[in-house]
Amino acid sequence: MTNIRKTHPLMKILNDAFIDLPTPSNISSWWNFGSLLGLCLIMQILTGLFLAMHYTPDTSTAFSSVAHICRDVNYGWFIRYLHANGASMFFICLYAHIGRGLYYGSYMFQETWNIGVLLLLTVMATAFVGYVLPWGQMSFWGATVITNLLSAIPYIGTTLVEWIWGGFSVDKATLTRFFAFHFILPFIITALAAVHLLFLHETGSNNPTGIPSNMDMIPFHPYYTIKDILGALLLILTLLALTLFTPDLLGDPDNYTPANPLSTPAHIKPEWYFLFAYAILRSIPNKLGGVLALLLSILILIFIPMLQTSKQRSMMFRPFSQLLFWTLIADLLTLTWIGGQPVEHPYIIVGQLASILYFLLILVLMPTAGLIENKLLKW
C-alpha cells in the first residue's frame, strides 16, 4: 500500500512542497528566510485576529480601544506588541530574503521574482494602513502625508486623494476603510505566497554557486525541516526579546499622543522599514519627482533580471560585484538613517548623494562590473 501522503489529493500537494521536495544540498542559512516569512505571516494573522476582536475602527474610540487592549484585555499588551514588533521582524526577513535573491542571482527565476516584488508592495501597503489604525499623532500625520503624495499625479491627483480619504481630510471614513484593507490584505498576501511557491517549485531552488544542482539534490525533510525549525526558534527568540524587554524600541513616541489635526508633530516620519524610501522621496525638491523616485526605488527590482550582464548567475565568484553589493547595503543603511533625521544641513546633501548612488549602483555600476568580470574570465 502506498503511503497516504503520496496519494491523498491534499496531502500530495503538501508532500511535494515540504517533504519529498528535491532541494540543493548546499543551500546556506540565507535560504531560511522564505520559511521565516511564512512564519511571520501566520503570527501576524493570528495576533491581528485577536487584536481585531477588541479594536474599534472609529476616530472617537480607536486610540482608547488600543489602550483598552493594553490595559484590560488578558495579555492584550503582549498580543499588541507581538503584532507591532512582528511587523519589524517581517521586514527584516523580507529585506534579507530580497538581498539573498540579489546576491545569488535568484531573480533569474523571473515569475517567482516578479510575484515576490508584488508581495513586497502588498506587505508595504499592509504595514502602512496598519500603522494608521492606533490613531496616534504619527498614524494620522503619516496617513495625511503619504496619501497626499498621490495629489502629485497630474489632472486626477486631487480627486484621487479625496476619493481615498472618503472626504476632504483624513477622517472617520479613512480609518474605517484602512481597517478593512488591513484585514483583507494579509489573506491576499497568503494567496500570492502560495503562487510564489508554485512558480518556485516549477524550477526548484537556486543555490549559492548559481550552478544547476540537478545532479546533487536531497529531500527537504528531514534536512531542511530541521534547519527551518532552528531558524524559526531564533526568530521567535529575537521577537520575544524585543517584545518583552524593549517593546517600544522601534516605535515612535508621538504615537502615544492621540491624533490631533490641529497640531503637527515636529518631525513626521514613517516606521524604520520605510525610512530608506522616505529619504529618497525627500531628497528630490519636487513633489512629482520625489513620488516617481519613491516608486522607482522599489519597482527597480522588476528590472534587475534585465540588467544582468554577467555570464555567472551568482556573485559567489565575482569580487567586484560583491564589493558593489555591500556598497548598496551600506547605502541603504545610510538612507535609513537619513530618513529619520530632520531636513537640514548636512542631512539634505548626504540624502541626495545616497539617493543618486542607490540608482547609480543598480542601473550603471553593477551591470558594468558584470561586463568587466566577463572579460576577466578570458584571462
From Swiss-Prot:
The keyword RNA-binding does not apply. InterPro entries: Cyt_b/b6_C, Cyt_b/b6_C_sf, Cyt_b/b6_N, Cytb/b6-like_sf, Cytochrome_b, Cytochrome_b_C_euk/bac, Cytochrome_b_N_euk/bac, Di-haem_cyt_TM. A ubiquinone binds at residue 201. Its main location: mitochondrion. Its cofactor is heme b. GO terms for cellular component: mitochondrial inner membrane; respiratory chain complex III. It is found in: Mitochondrion inner membrane. Coiled coil: none annotated. The keyword Transmembrane helix applies. Component of the ubiquinol-cytochrome c reductase complex (complex III or cytochrome b-c1 complex) that is part of the mitochondrial respiratory chain. The b-c1 complex mediates electron transfer from ubiquinol to cytochrome c. Contributes to the generation of a proton gradient across the mitochondrial membrane that is then used for ATP synthesis. The cytochrome bc1 complex contains 11 subunits: 3 respiratory subunits (MT-CYB, CYC1 and UQCRFS1), 2 core proteins (UQCRC1 and UQCRC2) and 6 low-molecular weight proteins (UQCRH/QCR6, UQCRB/QCR7, UQCRQ/QCR8, UQCR10/QCR9, UQCR11/QCR10 and a cleavage product of UQCRFS1). This cytochrome bc1 complex then forms a dimer. This is Cytochrome b. It comes from Delphinus delphis (Short-beaked common dolphin). The lineage of its organism: Eukaryota, Metazoa, Chordata, Craniata, Vertebrata. The gene is MT-CYB.
